[in-house]
Every structure is written in C-alpha cells, then in structure tokens.
A protein has these predicted regions:
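Primary mode marks residue(s) on the alpha4-beta5-alpha5 output face of response regulator receiver
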Residues: 26-55, 62-181
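C-terminal motif of bacterial Sec signal peptides marking the signal peptidase cleavage site
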Residues: 19-20
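Short, conserved catalytic or interaction motifs in soluble domains
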Residues: 23
Length: 181
C-alpha cells in the first residue's frame, strides 16, 4: 500500500509539473534572438501566418541619385490562424487589420537577418496606433519571424526601369503581444 501511495504521489507530482510547464508556455512567443524579444510585461495574444508579397519599386538610390535600386514600398498579405482561416490582412504602414476591424500599425524597433539569407529579415516592431476592440486593439509589440522569400530582386534595376514595380512572394509568422493582464 505504501508503494501505491508513493507511486500515486509521484504520478500526481509529475502531472503537476507537466501542467506547470505547459502553463508557463501560455502567452510566450517563439525562440528569437535577444534583440527581438517582446518587452517584459507583455504576453502573446495572437499568432498569424502571412502569405502575400513584398512590393518594391525601381527608384533612384537615396545615397546616390545617379544609381537606381529596388526600394521597398509596402507589404500586401493575407493573415491566417493556425486552422488556415483568413483572419485579416497586412498592408502599407505597416498595418495589420483583423476581420473584426481592429488594427495596429508598427514601427521597427529591432531586426535580425534570420537563418535564411534569401528571406526578408526578422523584426520586432513597436505598436504605434492600435485601434478597435478586437484582437489587434491592445497590441503593444509585433514580431515577424520564420520568413520565406520577399527579398528585393538580386539583379537590381537601372534608370530604364525607373518607376517599375515588382511583387515578390513571401511568407512569415507574426506574433502580436499585449500587456500582461
């Protein structure tokens, strides 16, 4: 009988530990470089998968107006939840807008090249103007990670292409953080 109680206690203790570990993961985002971590006091509120394009325009270089390059204009993507349901869109600003009409704009705070040299960088953004009562209305920070594609064309552009626009397919995961309740 002592063994059964001890075994039961061990099982109960193990179960409690597992529940504790699982609970500690709730509200946490992905493993990212230190400079891309959400600030203390914020918890993960929503994760969204983005599929769309990064839009570039052939324009005079900001550092040398006699040279031309592909300059980033805006993103254009649909946002999906983990079940594949469309939950919103991502567009210039940068802005994320939910189907519930809440939205948030972001401002880049930090960046990291990420593990894929052929993909756009990973970012941490500060929320500038969250609005609405929905999923994005309380957002304070946004992470862009797990990027695929989206980089400006490697071949560059010249004056003869000035004003031309190219749309480069990309995918990314966005994590939205709100204040800890």
């Amino acid at each position: 009988m002592i063994r059964k109680i001890a075994g039961t206690s061990a099982i109960a203790g193990t179960a409690a530990l597992l529940v504790s570990c699982a609970a500690s993961q709730v509200g946490m985002g992905p493993a990212v470089p230190e400079n891309l971590r959400a600030p203390a006091g914020q918890v993960l509120s929503i994760e969204a998968q983005a599929t769309g394009v990064q839009i570039y325009e052939c324009s005079a270089s900001k550092t040398d107006p006699t040279k031309f390059e592909w300059l980033f204009k805006a993103p254009e993507a649909d946002l999906f939840d983990s079940a594949g349901r469309k939950i919103g869109k991502h567009y210039a600003g940068p802005t994320w807008e939910s189907n519930d009409e809440s939205k948030v704009q972001g401002e880049v705070k930090a960046r990291d090249d990420g593990p894929d040299a052929n993909a756009i960088p990973w970012l941490l953004l500060n929320a500038k103007s969250p609005s609405g009562k929905g999923v994005f209305g309380q957002t304070q920070s946004i992470q862009r990670v797990r990027t695929v594609g989206g980089k400006a064309p490697a071949q560059g552009c010249g004056q003869e292409q000035a004003g031309q626009v190219t749309r480069v397919p990309y995918k990314a995961t966005y994590y939205f953080y709100a204040a800890r309740p």
